[in-house]
């Protein structure tokens, strides 16, 4: 029966809109002119948003070039109602990353994180994209698992032959030409015994096995400026065109962090000063091959590799344990992603098949606690039983297929998505300098699979000035996570959902004005990690993260109203009002019973929550050489947990983006400003207040000079360099303070 339902939802045939103009006369051959319009200019993006049946916002590569933004994560914060956490995770209309989804071309992107439902947008460089569109109201032909925004990233297209080279360098006020520490990662020995065999080994054998682990020394050196480079070329030959683009980047970041927590309003639990050294290396390649004939076909493949090498020194006092602390950690994260998709248009049909591979390795996460008794004149020593060496690997394969067909104004369609994930970890601590003790638990591995069959019917019709887009989407989901408890007994989490998701989009179109109304039902499903009975210790956050097998999906009801005005080409003014009602929202909370020195973060479903707000956007060309833009979002939310009311986790009360552009001949000068209101970083409990992230002002300045065959860009990032602060309202104290550096970058692009 389950298989039948999946097949039934995949059978409906889906539609596509043809960009084809056909000229036919008697006794003449039929001529078909096909084009692939490039949406890279600011005007083209405004026109796309204006014509769209759903409420959306977006940004083009032409606009991104006027900013210091190097990754999609940097660029997204320029879009109305969008904020970014940690330079990579997205919040839309104040909703945390888990309420948002992302697509690369026509394929849903997987979560890149082992401990949350989130895509790391800093993985994709802006050099590989043409535009980003964010849908904020739903339609039947879109995936149903989102509420804040559906981010649709379009990679580069080619319309003529070209060859481009880019070279760049960057300077950080805190990190460049400074003393830096790093340590090499260590692969897990291939001949090391299994957990069971190691545990039953004698001490002599354990010492021999322990020698297989390398103990690399800490490297100390002066940093060099950040470097990046790339090349891309396009080739057009008749009906075929191809594009290849590749880029590499190396960066150094140094953060000084103050970290503390309290047992009471005045009594400290710990007080640390951390220095965090991060070296990042990334490489990206994009290959597109397109056939433009009577029918069109395209193959698009993106390959990304990113490696983060982190080392941290921690000094301070732990008053709970009565210790002076002089500890260090090293961590390595390797992400490898392949996204490949093949799509085609055949008359009134279109189809898409895709494959995603996501590999994430954490080779040799090491914690080395060095302590002495507080206030005692004695040497520091390693607390062996608190040492930590951790290896983990996660792989996720996903396969998807969609087929569409249109019958005039009626569109029907269906699709299928399959995801398979495996996660495994090995954890050790030292009993002495030459012998490891394995502390891996049965909960430290899980497998998961996800099946989603979908089908929809959509009606898109114009009645004079009124345009109607309405439909029903049905999604049938099978969701399984398998792990073990501490005793070794299997623990399985199985979910089966059948969801009917109606949507209605109305627009009333005048010559320069548009009125929009939207109603829809969407949902938020738990991520594999959020329901897996697996605890992971995060030394940087000083907290453990644990899944909740009882976590349920959230149903969300959305209402949107929008007024749009387009005075002139490239100009727009808009006002949006929106509201959302959540049934069983999903949130990350601090578990009851946690103490500041041992926080436990997990996930829960409060009964209900709501969110409402207003968005304003203004873009005006004042003169031929001067234009201004601003977008502002003001929001409020409320969730009631056992009679205690608070805002949703991750939701800010306001978001502000503003900027000015000056253009004179071949020179462009841009100033961009961004500010996000305070938001809950982690939800507390009775006796332990919520942890808030404070707002800060971000100012960027860019100078762009057009050359005969290229351009040169000078960018000043985060000019104010204000620190990030985390605090608790009731205590009115800073728990965490992280410095943010000012940056200068210089980039040269040449078209050869």
Where do the language-model regions lie?
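A beta-strand signature from Gram-negative outer-membrane beta-barrel systems
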Residues: 124-166
């Amino acid at each position: 029966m389950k298989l039948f339902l999946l097949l039934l939802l995949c059978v409906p045939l889906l539609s596509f809109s043809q960009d084809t103009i056909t000229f036919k006369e008697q006794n003449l051959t039929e001529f078909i002119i096909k084009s692939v319009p490039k949406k890279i200019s600011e005007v083209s993006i405004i026109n796309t948003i204006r014509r769209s049946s759903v409420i959306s916002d977006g940004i083009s590569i032409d606009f991104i070039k006027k900013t210091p933004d190097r990754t999609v994560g940097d660029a997204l914060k320029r879009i109305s109602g969008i904020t970014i956490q940690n330079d990579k995770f997205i919040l839309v209309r104040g909703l945390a990353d888990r309420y948002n989804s992302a697509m690369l071309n026509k394929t849903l992107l997987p979560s890149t994180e082992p401990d949350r439902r989130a895509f790391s947008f800093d993985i994709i460089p802006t050099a590989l994209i043409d535009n980003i569109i964010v849908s904020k109201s739903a339609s039947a032909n879109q995936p149903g698992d989102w509420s804040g925004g559906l981010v649709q990233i379009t990679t580069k297209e080619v319309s003529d032959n070209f060859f481009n080279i880019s070279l760049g360098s960057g300077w950080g006020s805190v990190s460049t030409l400074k003393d830096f520490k790093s340590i090499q990662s260590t692969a897990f020995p291939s001949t090391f015994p299994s957990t069971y065999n190691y545990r039953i080994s004698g001490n002599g054998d354990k010492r021999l096995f322990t020698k297989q682990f390398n103990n690399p020394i800490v490297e100390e050196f002066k940093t060099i400026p950040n470097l990046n480079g790339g090349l891309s070329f396009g080739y057009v030959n008749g009906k075929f065109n191809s594009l290849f683009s590749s880029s590499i980047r190396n960066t150094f970041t140094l953060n000084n962090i103050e970290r503390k927590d309290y047992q009471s309003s005045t009594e400290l639990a710990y007080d640390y000063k951390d220095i965090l050294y991060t070296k990042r290396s990334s490489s990206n390649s994009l290959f597109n091959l397109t056939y433009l004939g009577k029918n069109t076909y395209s193959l698009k493949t993106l390959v990304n590799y990113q490696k983060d090498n982190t080392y941290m020194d921690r000094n301070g006092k732990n008053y709970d344990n009565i210790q002076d602390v002089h500890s260090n950690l090293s961590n390595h994260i390797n992400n490898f992603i392949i996204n490949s998709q093949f799509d085609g248009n055949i008359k009134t049909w279109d189809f898409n098949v895709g494959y995603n591979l996501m590999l994430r390795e954490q080779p040799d996460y090491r914690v080395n606690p060095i302590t002495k008794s507080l206030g005692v004149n004695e040497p520091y020593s390693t607390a062996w039983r608190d040492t930590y060496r951790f290896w983990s690997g996660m792989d996720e394969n996903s396969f998807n297929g969609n087929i569409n067909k249109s019958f005039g104004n009626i569109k029907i369609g269906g699709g299928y998505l399959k995801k398979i994930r495996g996660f495994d970890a090995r954890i050790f601590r030292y009993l002495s300098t030459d012998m490891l003790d394995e502390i891996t638990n049965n909960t430290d591995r899980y497998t998961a699979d996800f099946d989603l069959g979908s089908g929809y019917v959509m009606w898109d019709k114009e009645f004079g000035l009124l345009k109607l887009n309405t439909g029903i989407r049905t999604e049938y989901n099978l969701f399984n996570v398998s792990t073990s408890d501490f005793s070794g007994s299997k623990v399985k989490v199985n979910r089966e959902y059948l969801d009917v998701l109606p949507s209605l989009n109305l627009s009333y179109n005048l010559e320069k004005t548009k009125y929009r109304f939207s109603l829809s039902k969407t949902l938020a499903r738990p991520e594999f990690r959020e329901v897996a009975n697996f605890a992971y210790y995060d030394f940087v956050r000083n907290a453990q993260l644990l899944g909740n097998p009882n976590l349920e999906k959230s149903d969300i009801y959305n209402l949107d109203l929008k007024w749009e005005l387009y005075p002139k080409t490239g100009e727009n003014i808009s006002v949006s009002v929106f509201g959302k009602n959540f049934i069983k929202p999903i949130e990350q909370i601090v578990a009851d019973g946690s103490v500041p020195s041992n926080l436990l973060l997990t996930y829960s479903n409060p009964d209900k929550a709501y969110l409402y707000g207003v968005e304003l956007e203004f873009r005006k060309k004042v003169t031929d050489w001067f234009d201004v833009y601003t977008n502002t979002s003001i929001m409020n939310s409320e969730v009631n947990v056992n009679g205690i009311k608070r805002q949703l986790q991750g939701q800010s009360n306001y978001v502000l983006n503003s900027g000015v552009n000056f253009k004179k001949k071949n020179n462009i000068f841009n100033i961009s400003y961004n500010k996000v209101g305070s938001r809950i970083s982690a939800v507390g409990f009775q006796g332990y207040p919520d942890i808030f992230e404070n707002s800060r002002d971000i100012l960027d300045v860019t100078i762009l000079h057009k050359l005969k065959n290229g351009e040169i860009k000078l960018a000043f990032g985060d000019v104010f360099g204000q620190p990030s602060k985390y605090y608790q309202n009731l205590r009115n104290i800073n728990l965490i303070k992280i410095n943010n550096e000012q940056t200068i970058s210089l980039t040269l692009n040449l078209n050869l």
